[in-house]
């Protein structure tokens, strides 16, 4: 899809896309994919859509989830894309790492706390205690030949309310062999101006780190915030097919892709000619209908009067 619009060529860059449909998208109220459905979605995302990475589950949820992850890992290995399969894991005395390993995976997206409130009220730990547990989990994951990415849960609130805590954590975390830092707007509170400010601060303070941005759509700003994050130095974006996700959803894959390419000339590896196909597949499996006027993939999106 192309538009005759002047592009901001000074901003051209290559953006890594991680699809979270099978993990965060499944948090949509009433949505639960069967193992074979998760495999079919994963196959299309990896092979036909050519997304860079897929987050396929949360560790230790159920035996059905374990079966699904194992199937996906086996398939991904046959096409040389096992490194593209990621699982959300926890700081839980190595149980998540072992669970992922038993499934055949070796990339963990480790969930840490990005705000002082989450650290002290949810975990009931001091920042120093939390850091020690994170380091121990990472050491164990590395001993299993894992790649470690790290979520800073509630990052947006942390930047707004407890920046000293967040920077103290990051100052220590950047010393560890973490491949990517995943920065979620967990409660969907950001606007694009805040997203620009916060992402620029992260990039300037930690210029050698890779940052992903993970948007939520509570104010209908997930796509706008994703674009703001990229223009401010984020190297990766998290999306879901049809914008599925808890509460009001996540940034939709199709919208993010076409805006990045058409409006800003950003480079991705996404094959746009299959976006409608993956949208229909997920629509069928999820039971969540795509509105006819949905941008890019809606039935009315290409009709002009």
Predicted segment positions?
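Hydrophobic faces of well-ordered beta-strands that scaffold small-molecule active sites
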Residues: 17-20, 52-56, 83-89, 108-110, ...
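N-terminal capping/small domains of soluble enzymes
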Residues: 2-93
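Conserved small/polar residues in nucleotide/adenosyl-binding loops
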Residues: 303-305
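Catalytic cores of alpha/beta
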Residues: 95-100, 220-232
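Alpha-helix-loop-beta-strand connector modules within alpha/beta enzyme cores
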Residues: 65-87, 131-144, 198-213
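Glycine-rich, proline-tolerant flexible connector loops at the mouths of alpha/beta enzymes
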Residues: 51-75, 112-125, 154-158, 182-193, ...
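Active-site beta->alpha loop and helix N-cap motifs at the rims of alpha/beta catalytic domains
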Residues: 82-147, 154-165
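N-terminal small/glycine-rich loop or linker at the start of catalytic domains
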Residues: 7-30, 109-122, 141-156, 202-204, ...
């Amino acid at each position: 899809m192309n538009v005759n619009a002047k592009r901001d060529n000074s901003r051209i860059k290559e953006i890594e896309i991680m699809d979270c449909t099978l993990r965060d998208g499944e948090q949509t109220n009433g949505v639960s994919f069967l193992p074979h459905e998760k495999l079919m979605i994963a196959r299309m995302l990896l092979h036909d859509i050519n997304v860079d990475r897929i987050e396929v589950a949360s560790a230790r949820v159920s035996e059905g989830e374990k079966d699904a992850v194992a199937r996906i890992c086996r398939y991904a290995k046959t096409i040389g894309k096992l490194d593209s399969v990621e699982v959300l894991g926890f700081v839980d005395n190595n149980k998540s790492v072992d669970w992922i390993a038993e499934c055949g995976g070796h990339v963990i997206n480790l969930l840490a706390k990005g705000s002082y409130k989450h650290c002290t009220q949810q975990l009931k730990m001091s920042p120093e205690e939390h850091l020690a547990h994170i380091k121990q989990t990472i050491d164990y994951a590395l001993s299993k030949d894992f790649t470690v990415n790290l979520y800073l849960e509630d990052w947006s609130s942390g930047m707004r309310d407890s920046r000293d805590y967040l920077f103290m954590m990051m100052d220590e975390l950047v010393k560890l062999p973490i491949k990517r830092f995943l920065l979620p707007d967990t409660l969907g509170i950001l606007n694009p101006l805040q997203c620009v400010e916060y992402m620029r601060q992260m990039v300037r303070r930690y210029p050698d780190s890779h940052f992903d941005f993970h948007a939520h759509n509570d104010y209908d700003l997930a796509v706008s915030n994703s674009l703001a994050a990229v223009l401010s130095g984020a190297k990766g974006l998290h999306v879901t097919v049809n914008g599925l996700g808890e509460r009001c959803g996540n940034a939709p894959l199709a919208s993010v892709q076409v805006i990045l390419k058409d409006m800003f000339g950003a480079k991705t590896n996404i094959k746009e000619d299959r976006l409608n196909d993956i949208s229909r597949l997920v629509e069928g499996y999820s039971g969540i209908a795509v509105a006819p006027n949905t941008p890019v993939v809606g039935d009315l999106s290409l009709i002009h009067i």
